[in-house]
């Protein structure tokens, strides 16, 4: 009765839990860390049925979720520094999520914790509902599996065990028979002693008496037989003691032989299992060694996929690992670029610029240039410069161009503290180390001499956005934000991400112009000046770090007179290039990494770009 009462009481206690119902479903937009290329992306997240799923957007829910995790064993960890971020991990799978604000994050965490509590692993009621049946089924199946596997390969041992069972039964019967024999013998001896005592008492007169002459009178033989009768126990005449003893010895010998055989089988089985154990131990050792090696290799590689290992003030990656990861990413990009160039050469892609007179009018910009002839001169070039079309940045453009023409062409000697970092043939790259608030602001200056091209051609290809993707390999995408004049535009471009560094974007004004020669002996000079500006159409965003630039490409054309009355060919022209770059990368990249990347990438850029110009202008009329 008490059991029924306790059962009913426990059932009534569970009723409130049943009536509480399932946890409330939740859905909304969260930022999810996708990968190191795309970073944080907005995703439509749904919390339902103890599972967290995400979709690319709310409109694409009908196409199925992009991913889902069960919350039964999930671990929810709010980030220590980012108040809007929280991480959800299930075994090796980790989701990095960011809410709009800390309150929004806490609401999601509370909802997820509620679903986790009501899941199969977190609720006591769920354990009571599911535990018993699982335990019974698993216990029964486990026992049957063990029994079958234990004796499937042990027929000989099983037969010997059956023999020992038979020997045991025989031995028990023999022991019972011998015990009965010994008990009967003991009873017979006891009865004989009682009977002898009685005979002695009843026949005292039969014992010898003393005569008058001193001699003894002895009793007859019959009295002796009464006093010492022959001991023959009753009821055991049918037992063959000798035969039973022989059989007992044979049975024990059989048991010992069977035990010996069983021990031999077990020793063989033990040897077999020992060999298997040794193999498994060796396999485990090799697996652990391979695992350690794999973990070591993963640590060497850029395996950190989470946001904690990207560039930032609280990055968990050290400077050496940062440099190794950046170098590995740049090597991959170089390999991809080499494959792309090889494919272009194989397919013989057509040039992007037309030949002839149309060459001088690239894109939609007004460069009026007649085909060169001996009668034409440099002064005949009609360029619509920035001074002709006044815009709101005109004064700033004039100042930038004037500064570059004054200071950028100066010699690197003297007190400028320029350091020669790379020298390859005619190309020399100099650097001056400058840091401000921990940010590397090293000015860079490169000089180069390229045969067969003019300064106008080099600057034209450098400025023209229509051919930008043909030679620039670091840009992910770009577009012209505003056209200020025919030779002045504002460009917004996003550079390819080099993990673990953050992605960079640049918003800058790009202008091209010809600098008139002061004297007849001065070389023809063209300049492209790119410097950062602000524009409402390209505001700052959270995905990229906005870099600031002040870059100038200054090109001077030197012409050596041809022999005789021959026309000037590309063999007679030489372009002296001065490339100046002042870049503020922003962010938190280590100084040593930035300097190493600059030392590696700037010479590659200059060689790649000048080779591209030589390739595109080969066989075409000269553009002075």
From Swiss-Prot:
PROSITE patterns: PH_DOMAIN, START. Residues 389-618 form the START domain. An N-acylsphing-4-enine binds at residues 472, 493, 530, 579. Widely expressed. Keywords: Coiled coil, Cytoplasm, Disease variant, Endoplasmic reticulum, Golgi apparatus, Intellectual disability, Lipid transport, Lipid-binding, Phosphoprotein, Transport. Residues 263-303 form a coiled coil. Residues 1-11 have a biased composition (Polar residues). Changing residue 324 to A: Impairs the endoplasmic reticulum-to-Golgi ceramide trafficking and abolishes the interaction with VAPA and MOSPD2. Residues 1-24 are annotated as: Disordered. One of its GO terms (cellular component) is Golgi apparatus. Shelters ceramides and diacylglycerol lipids inside its START domain and mediates the intracellular trafficking of ceramides and diacylglycerol lipids in a non-vesicular manner. The START domain recognizes ceramides and diacylglycerol lipids, interacts with membranes, and mediates the intermembrane transfer of ceramides and diacylglycerol lipids. This is Ceramide transfer protein.
């Amino acid at each position: 009765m008490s059991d029924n009462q306790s059962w009913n009481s426990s059932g009534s206690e569970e009723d409130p839990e049943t009536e509480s119902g399932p946890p409330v479903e939740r859905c909304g937009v969260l930022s999810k860390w996708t990968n190191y290329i795309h970073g944080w992306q907005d995703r439509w997240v749904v919390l339902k049925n103890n599972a967290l799923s995400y979709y690319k957007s709310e409109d694409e829910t009908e196409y199925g979720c992009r991913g889902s995790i069960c919350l039964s064993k999930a671990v929810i960890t709010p980030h220590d520094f980012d108040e809007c971020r929280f991480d959800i991990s299930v075994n090796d799978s980790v989701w990095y999520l960011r809410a709009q604000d800390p309150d929004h994050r806490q609401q999601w965490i509370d909802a997820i914790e509620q679903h986790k509590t009501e899941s199969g692993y977190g609720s006591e009621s769920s354990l009571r509902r599911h535990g018993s049946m699982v335990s019974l089924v698993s216990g029964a199946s486990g026992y049957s599996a063990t029994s079958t596997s234990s004796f499937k390969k042990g027929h000989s041992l099983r037969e010997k065990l059956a023999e020992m069972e038979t020997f045991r039964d025989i031995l028990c019967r023999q022991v019972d028979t011998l015990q009965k024999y010994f008990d009967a013998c003991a009873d017979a001896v006891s009865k004989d002693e009682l009977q002898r005592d009685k005979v002695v008492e009843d026949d005292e007169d039969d014992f010898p008496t003393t005569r008058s002459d001193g001699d003894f009178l002895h009793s007859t033989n019959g009295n002796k037989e009464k006093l010492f009768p022959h001991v023959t126990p009753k009821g055991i005449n049918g037992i063959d003691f000798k035969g039973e003893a022989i059989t007992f010895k044979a049975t024990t010998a059989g048991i010992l032989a069977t035990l010996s055989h069983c021990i031999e089988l077990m020793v063989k089985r033990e040897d077999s299992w020992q060999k298997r154990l040794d193999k498994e131990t060796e396999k485990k050792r090799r697996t652990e060694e391979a695992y350690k090696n794999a973990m070591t290799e993963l640590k060497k590689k850029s395996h950190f996929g989470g946001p904690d290992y990207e560039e930032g003030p609280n990055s968990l990656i050290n400077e050496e690992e940062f440099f190794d990861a950046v170098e590995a990413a740049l090597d991959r990009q170089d390999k991809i670029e080499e494959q792309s160039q090889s494919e272009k050469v194989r397919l013989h892609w057509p040039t992007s610029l037309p030949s002839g007179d149309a060459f001088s009018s690239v894109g939609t910009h007004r460069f009026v240039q007649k085909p060169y002839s001996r009668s034409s001169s440099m002064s005949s070039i009609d360029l619509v410069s920035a001074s002709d079309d006044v815009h709101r940045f005109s004064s700033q453009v004039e100042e930038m161009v004037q500064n570059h023409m004054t200071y950028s062409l100066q010699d690197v000697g003297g007190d400028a503290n320029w350091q020669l970092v790379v020298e390859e043939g005619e190309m020399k790259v100099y650097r001056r180390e400058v840091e401000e608030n921990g940010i590397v602001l090293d000015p860079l200056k490169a000089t180069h001499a390229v045969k067969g091209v003019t300064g106008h051609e080099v600057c034209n290809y450098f400025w023209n956005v229509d051919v930008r993707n043909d030679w620039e390999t670091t840009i992910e995408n770009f577009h012209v934000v505003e056209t200020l004049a025919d030779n002045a535009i504002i460009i917004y471009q996003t550079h390819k991400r080099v993990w673990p560094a953050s992605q960079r974007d640049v918003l800058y004004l790009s202008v091209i112009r010809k600098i008139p020669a002061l004297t007849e002996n001065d070389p023809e000079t063209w300049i492209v000046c790119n410097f950062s500006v602000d524009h409402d159409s390209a505001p700052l965003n959270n995905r990229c770090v906005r870099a600031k630039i002040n870059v100038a490409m200054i090109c001077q054309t030197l012409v050596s007179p041809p022999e005789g009355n021959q026309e000037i060919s590309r063999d007679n022209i030489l372009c002296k290039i001065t490339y100046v770059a002042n870049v503020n990368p922003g962010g938190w990249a280590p100084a040593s990494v930035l300097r190493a990347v600059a030392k590696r990438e700037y010479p590659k850029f200059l060689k790649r770009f000048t080779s591209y110009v030589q390739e595109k202008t080969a066989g075409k009329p000269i553009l002075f």
